[in-house]
Amino acid sequence: MQPDLHSRALAAHTLQQFRILSPLTHCMTNDVVQNFTANTLLASGASPAMVIEPEEARQFAAIASALLINVGTLTRSRAEAMRAATEQAHIAKTPWTLDPVAVGALDYRRRFCLELLSLKPRAIRGNASEILALAGLAAGGRGVDTTDTAVSALPAAQALARQTGAVVAVTGEVDYVTDGQRTVSVTGGDVLMTRVVGTGCALSAVVAASCALPGNTLDNVASACSWMKQAGQSAAERSQGPGSFIPAFLDALYHLNAEEQV
């Protein structure tokens, strides 16, 4: 059965809620994308915070509206901080999202991500290779790049969602978002989104922030994917290449509104 296409009208309504709430999003993300991630959250309407010291991370996870764990530049000290934050988020019922960057290529981060799954993420966002690997299936991948397609990883995403209780977003040319029972697809975007560093990581931050919203988590996560794809498509139409794409993307996300999405 083909997944239903996520409603842009629902995405527009969710964006209105998102901007009213402006979720305080604790981003424990990788060094390469911190600035772009923070700016993406601000442009979308959320409020970013980057707190990484273990003692502070534990404390802040209970204060934040949502938490992102991105293992892109994982170190042992950073893993300690991430573990402390997710443990506190679990206790405080702060929704947290896992971005298992390059989990299929490197053993240490794979073991770490599998350990964190016991702390019940609200959402997991990754490319096809990452989702396949996290689900325990063979995957092709070169670091953060994927050699698998999102649709090929959909059964793994559905199984992972049932196993963990998380909403799983496997993203690519078409994004698929599933809770293990219901699945929706999200279209849009542009190839330029793959020609700059950080769009996937920034998407994970917006997904994390969306998990702070009331209502259905699957719909909220799919809406976050929709906002990013619509902004990417709009920015590509105004860009001459990767260098002009990033500021155009932030502008497009900032100006995204209900009328443009319906």
Curated annotation (Swiss-Prot):
EC numbers on record: 2.7.1.50
Residues at which ATP binds: 125, 171
Enzyme class: transferase
Keyword Transmembrane helix in record: no
DNA damage among keywords: no
Binding residues for substrate: 50, 198
One example of a Gene Ontology biological process annotation: thiamine diphosphate biosynthetic process
Cofactor field: Mg(2+)
Keywords, alphabetical: ATP-binding, Kinase, Magnesium, Metal-binding, Nucleotide-binding, Thiamine biosynthesis, Transferase
Pfam families: HK
Catalytic activity: 5-(2-hydroxyethyl)-4-methylthiazole + ATP = 4-methyl-5-(2-phosphooxyethyl)-thiazole + ADP + H(+)
Pathway(s) this gene product operates in, as recorded in its UniProt entry: Cofactor biosynthesis; thiamine diphosphate biosynthesis; 4-methyl-5-(2-phosphoethyl)-thiazole from 5-(2-hydroxyethyl)-4-methylthiazole: step 1/1
Entry GO MF terms: ATP binding; hydroxyethylthiazole kinase activity; magnesium ion binding
Role of this protein: Catalyzes the phosphorylation of the hydroxyl group of 4-methyl-5-beta-hydroxyethylthiazole (THZ).
Similarity section: Belongs to the Thz kinase family.
Name by which UniProt lists this protein: Hydroxyethylthiazole kinase
Native organism: Citrobacter koseri (strain ATCC BAA-895 / CDC 4225-83 / SGSC4696)
